[in-house]
Amino acid sequence: MKTRVGVLYGGKSPEHQVSLSTARAVMNAIDPHKFDVIPIYITPEGQWIKGKRLTGTVEEVKQLQFTSTATAMIPVSLNQVPASGSATESDEETIDVIFPLLHGPNGEDGTVQGLLEMLNLPYVGNGVLASAVGMDKVVMKNLFAQAGLRQAKYVSVTKYEWKKGGEAVYDRIEQELGYPCFVKPANAGSSVGISKCKQRDDLKTAFAEAFKYDRKIIIEESIVGREIEIGVIGNDEPICSVAGEIVPKKEFYDYEAKYEDGQTELIIPANVTEEQYETIKSMAIAAFKALDLSGLARVDFFLAEDGTVYINEVNTMPGFTPYSMFPLLWQHSGVPYSELIERLIALALERHQEKQMITYTFEK
């Protein structure tokens, strides 16, 4: 009997379109002999719409953008959830595991993961806490520091502090970090809202842009060097892929460079020494464990001109688009795309089975 996979995508997020591209790629790559795919679309307004079981190739992402005339779902309806933990009423439509392909807020940040936990449904990827920490760059970097992982200097600022502090906030950035520096929303991915600043006027513009996407931002010193990324999969015994290098044709790796074909060169495997690769692997595994990750992650690094390795961030649900680094890293590590998806589903079921052994009641 085939495993029924509910592919969850879209979402109320600035990265809605990225999610659609990722979902299309995964749906077309998943092995139809082993899995039945049930699309579940979350509109930009937050409505959940369940499509019919996939029977062919998804040619264009617009095929995945269901309208309100399709079957609407109520995300939480406990009377629809049998003891087995399935997501729908009839056995014919039972979903065995959810593959959340949601990027950014309201999807990659632990919110949907919490819902799936409440429904007792297996799901691919990281849990509630790990997803939330992986989305919040400030909390993430605080944990990196606690774990002793080398990283660029950074400062965090809330919108309230910015409005109240005025020019003093910019003074602090210049004193602690200097120029150039990068300004990012704390809770956004895919380089949404990121700016490179070379002077105070840039900083003012960058703050206004980043605060469109979050109430908290992070400012980081610029590390001159190369951008190296590595894939990690697993639960209690995570393993790493080969390393890859990002060579953006623009000044830095922004949204367009990530998702527009021809904007970025990916070098796989990266031209690093064996010692550097071992350091990158070791730091990636340490970060994976420090943040209590499970399933998968892409860990990003800077390799400075002097050979020093700095951890940048983790991505708890890396993209699976045709131009995405994560699946390409695993393909070059001997794990084809469809097999990678199959492994991630197996890891999700393994973790869920382990959770079923936990006792949630207490009697004296």
From Swiss-Prot:
Residues 141-346 form the ATP-grasp domain. GO terms for biological process: cell wall organization; peptidoglycan biosynthetic process; regulation of cell shape. NCBIfam families: D_ala_D_alaTIGR (TIGR01205), PRK01372.1 (NF002378), PRK01966.1-2 (NF002526), PRK01966.1-4 (NF002528). Gene3D superfamilies: 3.40.50.20, ATP-grasp fold, A domain, ATP-grasp fold, B domain. InterPro entries: ATP-grasp (IPR011761), ATP_grasp_subdomain_1 (IPR013815), D-Ala_lig_Van_CS (IPR000291), D_ala_D_ala (IPR005905), Dala_Dala_lig_C (IPR011095), Dala_Dala_lig_N (IPR011127), PreATP-grasp_dom_sf (IPR016185). The gene is ddl. Binds 2 magnesium or manganese ions per subunit. GO terms for molecular function: ATP binding; D-alanine-D-alanine ligase activity; metal ion binding. It is found in: Cytoplasm. Pfam families: Dala_Dala_lig_C, Dala_Dala_lig_N. GO terms for cellular component: cytosol. It catalyses: 2 D-alanine + ATP = D-alanyl-D-alanine + ADP + phosphate + H(+). Mg(2+) 2 binds at E313, N315. This is D-alanine--D-alanine ligase. The keyword Manganese applies. Belongs to the D-alanine--D-alanine ligase family. Its EC number is 6.3.2.4. Pathway: Cell wall biogenesis; peptidoglycan biosynthesis. Its cofactor is Mg(2+); Mn(2+). PANTHER family: D-ALANINE--D-ALANINE LIGASE (PTHR23132), D-ALANINE--D-ALANINE LIGASE A (PTHR23132:SF25). ATP binds at residues 174-229. Mg(2+) 1 binds at D300, E313. Its main location: cytoplasm. Keywords: ATP-binding, Cell shape, Cell wall biogenesis/degradation, Cytoplasm, Ligase, Magnesium, Manganese, Metal-binding, Nucleotide-binding, Peptidoglycan synthesis. It comes from Geobacillus thermodenitrificans (strain NG80-2). Cell wall formation.
